[in-house]
């Protein structure tokens, strides 16, 4: 079941986000946050979110400031004149705390593409203790290799089970 909610961004505009919750909940497997790329919006992920929802996951897809339903006072892709990265990190953390209040004792994972992947990478550096794993689709550099690999491995364990083994080359990196 999909429903839309909003919260007030640290940039003083409303951020719209969509929550997809399973129809029948015995126990939610995890909460998945989707951070999309710059020229996308939350509705692009309806099919994926519904698929994961049917598998027992709660999926949260937000349109950060300057995207999709959150465009009210901003042009597409425009975030404002201030320290944008800091504001986006605070907004992401606020949304996670909102969901943590609803789904306690539930693992949290992030999935990101393009700019969304870059945001998650920064979020992991600041708030990595608040979630269990991430899947980044796009350029990944600048995060400590050990922390990055652990978060990715945790995501694969969630999807494939505890006994799943990755190919040794799957997470090979040039990061130092």
Positions of predicted regions on the chain:
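N-terminal cap/lid segment of alpha/beta-hydrolase-fold proteins
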Residues: 1-24
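Active-site glycine-rich loops that stabilize anionic/oxyanionic intermediates
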Residues: 37-40
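Conserved alpha/beta-hydrolase
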Residues: 44-75
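Alpha/beta-hydrolase active-site loop
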Residues: 80-100
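Alpha/beta-hydrolase fold nucleophile elbow
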Residues: 102-114
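Glycine-rich nucleophile elbow surrounding the catalytic serine of serine-hydrolase chemistry
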Residues: 112-122
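Alpha/beta-hydrolase-fold enzymes
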Residues: 121-176
